[in-house]
Amino acid sequence: MKANILKLLFLFCSVIVLSACDTDDDLPSSKVPETVKSAFDAKFPTVNRVEWEKKSGYYVAEFHENGVEMQTWFDADAVWCMTETDLRTDLNGLPGLVQNAFQTGEYADWRVDDIDKYERPAGVFYLIEIEKNGQKDRDLFYDENGNLLKDVVDTEKDTVLPNISFN
């Protein structure tokens, strides 16, 4: 009996600690500037359900469009900065040039953990997160033409900011 109570107490404390570790700053819609909400509505007029967060000074809308999980980022002046689309692990969601570059590249035998498409005013890029037993997970960034822009060890920090540079 005492062991069960201790297990429940441990579980309760774990839930409290883990929920306190959430680094996202959820934002009620009432705290999002009207200009940002209007910019979102203009860009995504068919989306009804939106959850807002504030990340690194950006207003981030999380939503689903046509069953696909997406995030879009606006700055404080309501200027659209980036949209992230979750392609899950389906290489077929990638342009042919990107698919081919990955499948014929150095990491072709690694397992794809996640794929995201990023659209910015400066253009589109793709992030393929990969893993392989005994190796550190990697993040591969490709442009639309299949050029590998960046190959880095995955830091477990899943946030790609709109101002990411490939230099």
Predicted features and spans:
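Bacterial N-terminal signal peptides that target proteins for export
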Residues: 1-9
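Hydrophobic helical h-region of N-terminal Sec-dependent signal peptides
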Residues: 10-15
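C-terminal motif of bacterial Sec signal peptides marking the signal peptidase cleavage site
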Residues: 17-20
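Bacterial signal peptide processing site
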Residues: 22-25
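First exposed extracellular module after export/assembly in secreted or surface-exposed proteins
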Residues: 29-167
